[in-house]
């Protein structure tokens, strides 16, 4: 279709030139036209030039179709769909293998104190926001920001790491920069070397376009991401500078936590199971409080007895203040209502915790005191 339109254009232009030549030709005494040798030569040259241009156009189009692997019999739509078929992104099933989790579950476990940001929308992550982790490079994004990129590209938008899974090859669980944090700079792995080569690559293309439909409700710090991403790949920066700048976009976790995130995501493959990460524990016997959820208006306290067993009871933070007991497998309740373990040791002492307002208005002298209630009477231990 394109070739025929070009041939018709050349033919029309040639006929126009022929009319000009005929109009400029000489007439003899009998009224007949006579062509001079110069006019004949001009006509032959013009016909030859246009014929050569047509042949070259057809040849170049055939070569282009062969280079792109297109079939000439596929219809006119093939010429328009060349750009769409040359840039495929990641499959949806591959994108789902990248773990997603709330930021609050890893905020206290991450290595480093620098604020963590999304490189696309340039917003700091909040506790209730969901993160998507790229296992190959440990960069984190909002799912609405990175999913649009991954559907059209196969690399990380920051470090250009290849995210296409290789059959038979497991996903790398090496955390970049972990050796530097722990002081083991002498231990170098091929994964770290490959990542450094990617970071110092001359390919400095930035994110061209991102669909913002998933994060339109979040305020943006800038209408464009080019200026902030450009400083990561500035030619004047040293080889170690890009990696330093990427720290605020990199989630560094302990190795076992990182492996648990990646393996749980690969295992569920579309299931909506909740990920349970280990909590920090203290080896010192004593008391510890924690939240049971703001919607329940409870927080729990934990007590370690002399035998090292854990005693956990929730405490209401709304009047009337009371405690509820959570019976462990090692505890039973006798007929009088007192707690006993299976060995017969009494656990009748219930901890009474003052409200935060009482702690605020009491002096420092009583700040560290704890009281115990037994059958409604307070007696210190």
Swiss-Prot record:
Indicate where this protein resides in the cell: Membrane
Q: Which domain of life is it from?
A: Eukaryota
Q: How does it sit in the membrane?
A: Single-pass membrane protein
Keywords, ordered alphabetically: Membrane, Metal-binding, Signal, Transferase, Transmembrane, Transmembrane helix, Ubl conjugation pathway, Zinc, Zinc-finger
Its pathway, per UniProt, is:
Protein modification; protein ubiquitination
User: Function of this protein?
Assistant: E3 ubiquitin-protein ligase able to catalyze polyubiquitination with ubiquitin-conjugating enzyme E2 UBC8, UBC10, UBC11, UBC28 and UBC29 in vitro.
> What name is this protein filed under?
E3 ubiquitin-protein ligase ATL15
Q: Which organism is it from?
A: Arabidopsis thaliana (Mouse-ear cress)
Q: What are the leading ranks of the lineage?
A: Eukaryota, Viridiplantae, Streptophyta, Embryophyta, Tracheophyta
């Amino acid at each position: 279709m394109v070739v025929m339109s070009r041939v018709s254009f050349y033919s029309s232009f040639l006929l126009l030139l022929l009319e000009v030549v005929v109009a400029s030709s000489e007439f003899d005494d009998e009224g007949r036209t006579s062509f001079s040798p110069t006019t004949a030569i001009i006509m032959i040259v013009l016909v030859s030039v246009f014929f050569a241009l047509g042949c070259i156009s057809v040849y170049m189009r055939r070569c282009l179709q062969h280079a792109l692997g297109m079939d000439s019999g596929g219809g006119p739509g093939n010429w328009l769909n060349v750009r769409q078929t040359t840039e495929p992104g990641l499959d949806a099933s591959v994108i789902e293998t990248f773990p997603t989790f709330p930021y609050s579950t890893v905020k206290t476990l991450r290595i480093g104190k620098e604020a963590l940001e999304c490189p696309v929308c340039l917003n700091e992550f909040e506790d209730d926001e969901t993160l998507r982790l790229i296992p190959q490079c440990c960069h984190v994004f909002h799912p609405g920001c990175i999913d649009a990129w991954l559907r059209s590209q196969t690399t990380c938008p920051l470090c250009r790491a290849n995210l296409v899974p290789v059959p038979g090859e497991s996903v790398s669980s090496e955390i970049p920069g972990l050796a530097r944090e722990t002081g083991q700079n002498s231990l170098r792995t091929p994964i770290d070397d490959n990542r450094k080569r990617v970071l110092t690559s001359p390919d400095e293309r930035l994110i061209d376009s991102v669909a913002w439909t998933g994060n339109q409700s979040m305020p943006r710090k800038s209408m464009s991401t080019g200026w902030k991403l450009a400083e990561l790949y500035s030619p004047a920066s040293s080889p170690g500078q890009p990696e330093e700048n990427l720290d605020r976009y990199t989630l560094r976790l302990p190795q076992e936590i990182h492996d648990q995130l990646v393996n749980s995501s690969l295992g569920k493959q579309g299931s909506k199971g909740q990920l349970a990460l280990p909590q920090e524990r203290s080896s010192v016997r004593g008391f510890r409080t924690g939240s049971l959820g703001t919607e329940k208006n409870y927080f729990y306290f934990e007590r370690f007895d002399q035998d090292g067993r854990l005693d956990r009871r929730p405490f209401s933070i709304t009047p009337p203040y009371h405690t509820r007991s959570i019976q462990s497998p090692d505890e039973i309740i006798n007929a009088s209502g007192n707690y006993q373990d299976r060995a017969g040791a009494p656990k009748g002492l219930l901890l009474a915790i003052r409200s935060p307002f009482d702690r605020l208005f009491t002096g420092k002298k009583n700040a560290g005191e704890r009281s115990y209630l037994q059958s409604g009477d307070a007696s210190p231990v």
